[in-house]
Amino acid sequence: MRNFIIAASLLTSAAACNDSPGEIKDPPQLRIDSPARSTIQGKAGLVKVTGVVAPNEVSGEAVEKVLVNNVQATLNADGSFSAMIEVKPGATLITTTARDAAGSYAEDTRAIQAGELRKVGTMIDDALTASMSKTAFAKLSGAASTMIEHLDFMPILAPMQPMAHAGDEAGEDCLFGRMYVDNVSLANADISIVPTNAGLQFRAQIDGLDVPGHARYAVACVNGSNTVRVKAARVVVAGTLVVTPNGPQGFKTSLTGETVTITGLDIQASGIPGAVIDFLSLDKIAGYVISKAAPLAMEPMMNKALGGLAGPQSVDVMGKTLQMEVDPSAIDIDATGALITLNTKMLIKGTETSPGFIFTDNAMPNMEPGNGFALGIADDLVNQMMAEMKETGLMNLAMPATGGTFDNTNIAMSLPPMISADPADGKLKVILGDMIATYTDHGTPVAKAAINAAIELKVVPAANGYGVALELGKPTAKVTVMDDIANATRLTNEDLALATEGCLKGQIETISKLLVNIPLPAIGGLQMRNMKIGSDDGYVMLKGDIE
């Protein structure tokens, strides 16, 4: 049987896999003996490709040369050939081309994956990296101001109640006082977060602060209770905002070296004895509330801005449960901004029996954020997720066809998709290796082909522009019609190859639904602009501006 392959960029995403007969061509006969299709090996390095070529039975044209990934093979008189090619860590597509004297050619493309096999669901060190510039922190400050103005302070203050107390170390006795905050409101907030070599310089200016509450007390063994209200025209709290990793809970924030300045203090405590007011230090309560609540309010914002999840989470992906855990491992702050690294693991429930994913050791990428931000996503994280998706079986598709010589195409994944660097341009692409397409007519197999594709990665806005997500772009496919089943479709190998390409749409949709669940930074009120995608030492790199 003729072995023919066509490489083409898809210009359409037709759902059906149909085509019509074309002109029969007479390429040489080509058989690959090694490596086997869908090979997984433990390390990168040189791989020997062997096979046999012969003239086409009709044309009889002699085979002049054989190329394997553009490396000329040693071609023997009996038609056997061999070539040594370099396989790098990750996924590699091996294309063998045999060309005869008339210019006709036959091709075979197959995939090989090389590297350390690791169990799915394992923690990936430094899976996510993020850097924010000083300019980005200025934008973050504006978002923080808006957030504080609309913040419900009470859940934050609840564990601290009573907010002021004295004389109650042994319980409520003859001389004690306790003051509870009932609500916090304000007219305006101005937050400043500036990275310095000493940490994040934090300043919160609150105008029109109003803190109603109630007090319970006793003086000379006489108990009492009453309402109290503390107001201030302006409260300014400043200090160093300390952001530290807090395991699966994300980041923890606290304020050190704080200073508090209060202007226009008004304490309304009619009926409360002066002694109680004094030892409760109600004149300091306004500053105390802001100095404690404002830094804690920064915690969820920092988690969103820096990529933390504030605890393990589960999301639904095409009916499957994806469990995510992000553990910050380090945060380094200096006058230019901040660099954050996060360890991450993803596990789709029910895929624990997967053979695993190929792990490639990466160095830290260049995280220069410019005047905006930079994000790095390790290929290992995405490859782990795609190995799990393969194990679910959701990528094995049955696609009906009408009006042709076959009525259905069944696609089975023999290898998990992988992100790998394209040897031609160094860009990271998703490699779909050796997807096996079986064409059937009323349930009877009538042809078989192997699909190998490289798909561009794109970065797109998410969450209405307030976040970013990865998306698959335009694929380039190579389809090799296989000899396992005689081609009874009455289509040429070229036609069958073109028909098969349309089936990639389903695979792209499945992978895209998976990629959008990677937890990337998103800050309420700030939009990601001028997004660019690149690669650096095994990381997908996203860079852009914050507005």
Q: Predicted segment positions?
A:
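Extended, low-charge, aliphatic-rich alpha-helical segments
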Residues: 115-207, 268-547
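Edge beta-strands of extracellular beta-sandwich domains
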Residues: 103-115
